[in-house]
């Protein structure tokens, strides 16, 4: 338009919290973007509305059973409708400059890999991809001249703090955690924490699963592993600090003693906008911090008794191989059981640990080569292992 090239983009996970925040930014500059594909889950009505408004080429629902509903909602719009995992991978192969990967869970891995194989810039909000197959993703990006930009607020903060720096000069990386909904609860009370209580976050507006993962610190455990995979630092160089205000997102310590921090309001549009506009910084509709009004920033060390997920993350990083895929699969399934009311809040950690141990006891499984097929297999086996433990406990 008038000599300005529109940026071709796709958003996978468009109906979730990250996807909707991305669309909010796109909506503010519609002439700058040509939307190729949008994908979503059960919220077919929202997916169709957004696809029509943004004039996407194709809209994909993850669920085959919802395809006819999506087709009906898109009738006469000119937007193609599709469903299922294969359609997602096909959409990822379509020419694009930038793809947002915000699908929750291991389902985001295959389309993410396909996008990187096309040389597309991948804005990665799907932390499970890096946890399950970080080496595979990073190698695929390198092989095809593609770039991965982090969208987690913590990893975006680290990425920004490292601009102009050399990773070998980094002494430590500190990612912060709000502490979640139960940060000030007595430990004993956590045994009876309800689904509704775990689904409420004090600072961030997020989806239910990630909010529960925040309360249990499984979200932070994934982010610790993600930090290792993305930035290539040793496990012992990664620290977590509980920071209740969620204003300092990460800090990078260098060998000269300097500590670089990134501050911003708890609004995911910061990290999304940075990835969308990188290497430029465009204006964003987010709150500006008034440090004088804030007055003080609070930090404290995490209690590993309260947050056993952080201990498990260190064990997974030391173990290496496909243990990240096993950890994530077991964690996801344990979360399913908590949401379904079959187990208590604290049972998620012990279940995940048991599922992980079951797979690690199988000779050669965790040390198998890192391929998409092996990652998918280990993820499936971890989920089944957790199901078996739940059946034994409740049966």
Swiss-Prot record:
It comes from Ruegeria sp. (strain TM1040) (Silicibacter sp.). 1-deoxy-D-xylulose 5-phosphate binds at residues 127, 153-154, 178, 201, 214, 219-220, 223. This is 1-deoxy-D-xylulose 5-phosphate reductoisomerase. Pathway: Isoprenoid biosynthesis; isopentenyl diphosphate biosynthesis via DXP pathway; isopentenyl diphosphate from 1-deoxy-D-xylulose 5-phosphate: step 1/6. Keywords: Isoprene biosynthesis, Manganese, Metal-binding, NADP, Oxidoreductase. SUPFAM superfamilies: 1-deoxy-D-xylulose-5-phosphate reductoisomerase, C-terminal domain (SSF69055), Glyceraldehyde-3-phosphate dehydrogenase-like, C-terminal domain (SSF55347), NAD(P)-binding Rossmann-fold domains (SSF51735). One of its GO terms (molecular function) is 1-deoxy-D-xylulose-5-phosphate reductoisomerase activity. It comes from the Bacteria. NADPH binds at residues 15-18, 41, 43, 126, 128, 207. HAMAP family: DXP_reductoisom. The keyword Metal-binding applies. It is an enzyme of class 1 (oxidoreductase). It catalyses: 2-C-methyl-D-erythritol 4-phosphate + NADP(+) = 1-deoxy-D-xylulose 5-phosphate + NADPH + H(+). GO terms for biological process: isopentenyl diphosphate biosynthetic process, methylerythritol 4-phosphate pathway involved in terpenoid biosynthetic process. Its cofactor is Mg(2+); Mn(2+). Mn(2+) binds at residues 152, 154, 223. Belongs to the DXR family.
């Amino acid at each position: 338009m008038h000599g300005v090239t529109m940026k071709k983009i796709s958003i996978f996970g468009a109906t979730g919290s990250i996807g909707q925040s991305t669309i909010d930014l796109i909506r503010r500059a519609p002439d700058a973007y040509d939307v190729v594909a949008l994908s979503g889950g059960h919220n077919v009505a929202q997916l169709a509305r957004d696809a029509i408004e943004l004039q996407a080429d194709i809209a994909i629902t993850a669920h085959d059973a919802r395809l006819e509903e999506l087709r009906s909602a898109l009738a006469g719009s000119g937007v193609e409708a599709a469903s299922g995992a294969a359609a997602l991978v096909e959409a990822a192969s379509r020419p694009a400059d930038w793809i947002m990967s915000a699908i929750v869970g291991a389902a985001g891995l295959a389309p993410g890999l396909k996008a990187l194989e096309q040389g597309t810039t991948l804005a990665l909000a799907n932390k499970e991809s890096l946890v399950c197959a970080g080496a595979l993703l990073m190698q695929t990006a390198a092989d095809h001249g593609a770039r991965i930009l982090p969208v987690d607020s913590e990893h975006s903060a680290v990425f920004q703090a490292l601009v102009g720096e050399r990773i070998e000069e980094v002494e430590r990386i500190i990612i912060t955690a709000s502490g979640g909904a139960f940060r000030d609860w007595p430990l004993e009370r956590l045994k009876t924490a309800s689904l509704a209580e775990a689904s409420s976050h004090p600072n961030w507006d997020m989806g239910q699963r990630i909010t529960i993962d925040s309360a249990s610190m499984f979200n932070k455990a994934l982010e610790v592993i993600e930090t290792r995979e993305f930035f290539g630092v040793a496990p012992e160089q990664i620290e977590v600090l509980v920071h209740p205000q969620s204003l300092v997102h990460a800090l990078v310590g260098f060998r000269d003693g300097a500590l670089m921090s990134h501050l911003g309001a708890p609004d995911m549009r910061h990290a999304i906008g940075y990835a969308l506009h990188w290497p430029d910084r465009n204006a964003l509709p987010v709150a500006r911090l008034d440090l004088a009004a804030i007055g003080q920033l609070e930090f404290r060390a995490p209690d590993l008794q309260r947050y056993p997920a952080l201990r498990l993350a260190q064990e997974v990083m030391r173990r290496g191989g496909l243990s990240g895929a096993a950890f994530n699969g077991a964690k996801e399934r344990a979360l399913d059981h908590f949401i379904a009311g079959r187990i208590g809040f604290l049972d998620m950690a012990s279940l995940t640990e048991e599922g992980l141990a079951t797979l690690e006891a199988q000779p050669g499984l965790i040390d198998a080569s890192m391929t998409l097929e092996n990652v998918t297999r280990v993820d499936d086996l971890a989920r089944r292992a957790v199901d078996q433990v739940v059946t034994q406990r409740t049966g």
